[in-house]
């Protein structure tokens, strides 16, 4: 081939590549709109394709968009396997009381279970992250990125400890809080995730000498919740159990009402009592076969079955509006799910733990 002919051929090939590249180019505003509609796991794949797409998915306005899409995440352990499932919350009108069936599962996977880890969590999902323990060493988990990050022991002298996870809305950082649970203390250790010195724990004084309540299986081991940057958890001071600005929901033998006590003023310790319709008004199974796992951002109580066998149901109750919604999720705990994962068809799924207001996050640990 002559040099001139070879040069012309190369120019033609370059034009074709340029034309092909331009035909595949997507304007940033359209790409952003598409990404905002996708689950986080799909966004991660696309962000690796082009640098300008990666700049979209790492922008604060984009990552914050996941906060408006809370989902129900649940997980359980079977032998040495760790199963994780995320399902969306259905779109329901405020006063709608109907049954829903959904076949949409946002994410479902299994991974080897972290060795020697305490399976019970003591904090809800906090801006997409969940905290575990491995003996006296905390473990932070990002379910979206499927990553576990072990942390150093906060204090070598502590024989046992409790860890909580919080989020600072001003600094936009997650913070792990640890304190001894076998003795009262007026100190805690705090580690800021993503900081330059991420492996360093700092000591912070508390207002009271106390220790977190160990709880039991009935009250889910004294869970903690982070609200507007403040941690609320069950604790004991002088043998009295205290709780922050929170609410106690009664499940006593009150047949005609469901009592709730709300701490209105933290400093004055003023409590208000509210009485709602009993659970049996909505569904008789709620009294004995379902358990309360949390509350939505809209104030709905969330109930799930004590034992999941073939059908996975979630009940949402708004005690103020007096509405009831039953949601049935297909593809979860049914025959197909069990066969695919080798879980057997004749035994219930046990030890399921729930995170009712989980949001996805692309945060790297």
From Swiss-Prot:
<feature type="domain" description="F-box">
    <location>
        <begin position="20"/>
        <end position="69"/>
    </location>
</feature>
<dbReference type="InterPro" id="IPR001810">
    <property type="entry name" value="F-box_dom"/>
</dbReference>
<dbReference type="InterPro" id="IPR036047">
    <property type="entry name" value="F-box-like_dom_sf"/>
</dbReference>
<dbReference type="Pfam" id="PF08268">
    <property type="entry name" value="FBA_3"/>
</dbReference>
<dbReference type="InterPro" id="IPR013187">
    <property type="entry name" value="F-box-assoc_dom_typ3"/>
</dbReference>
<feature type="region of interest" description="Disordered">
    <location>
        <begin position="1"/>
        <end position="20"/>
    </location>
</feature>
<dbReference type="Pfam" id="PF00646">
    <property type="entry name" value="F-box"/>
</dbReference>
<dbReference type="InterPro" id="IPR017451">
    <property type="entry name" value="F-box-assoc_interact_dom"/>
</dbReference>
<protein>
    <recommendedName>
        <fullName>F-box protein At1g48060</fullName>
    </recommendedName>
</protein>
